[in-house]
Amino acid sequence: MADTTGRIPLWLIGTVTGIIVIGLLGIFFYGSYSGLGSSL
């Protein structure tokens, strides 16, 4: 875990990507559910 200098660990990329994707999907579905998604 300490040898991550000069290269981003793959688990960190996967975690950040997963959080971003889940966040975007959550915002999209919440917006469409509350009626704000129809105006996009």
Curated annotation (Swiss-Prot):
A Pfam family that the UniProt record links to this protein: PsbJ
Record InterPro entries: PSII_PsbJ, PSII_PsbJ_sf
Topology with respect to the bilayer: Single-pass membrane protein
Keyword Repressor: no
Cellular location(s): Plastid, Chloroplast thylakoid membrane
Domain of life (superkingdom): Eukaryota
UniProt keywords, alphabetically: Chloroplast, Membrane, Photosynthesis, Photosystem II, Plastid, Reaction center, Thylakoid, Transmembrane, Transmembrane helix
Chief localisation class: plastid
Transmembrane segments: 8-28
Listed GO biological process terms: photosynthesis
UniProt entry tagged with the keyword Transmembrane: yes
CC per GO annotation: chloroplast thylakoid membrane; photosystem II reaction center
Family, per entry: Belongs to the PsbJ family.
PANTHER family associated with the record: PHOTOSYSTEM II REACTION CENTER PROTEIN J
Function as written in the Swiss-Prot or TrEMBL entry: One of the components of the core complex of photosystem II (PSII). PSII is a light-driven water:plastoquinone oxidoreductase that uses light energy to abstract electrons from H(2)O, generating O(2) and a proton gradient subsequently used for ATP formation. It consists of a core antenna complex that captures photons, and an electron transfer chain that converts photonic excitation into a charge separation.
Quaternary structure and partners: PSII is composed of 1 copy each of membrane proteins PsbA, PsbB, PsbC, PsbD, PsbE, PsbF, PsbH, PsbI, PsbJ, PsbK, PsbL, PsbM, PsbT, PsbX, PsbY, PsbZ, Psb30/Ycf12, at least 3 peripheral proteins of the oxygen-evolving complex and a large number of cofactors. It forms dimeric complexes.
Protein name according to UniProt: Photosystem II reaction center protein J
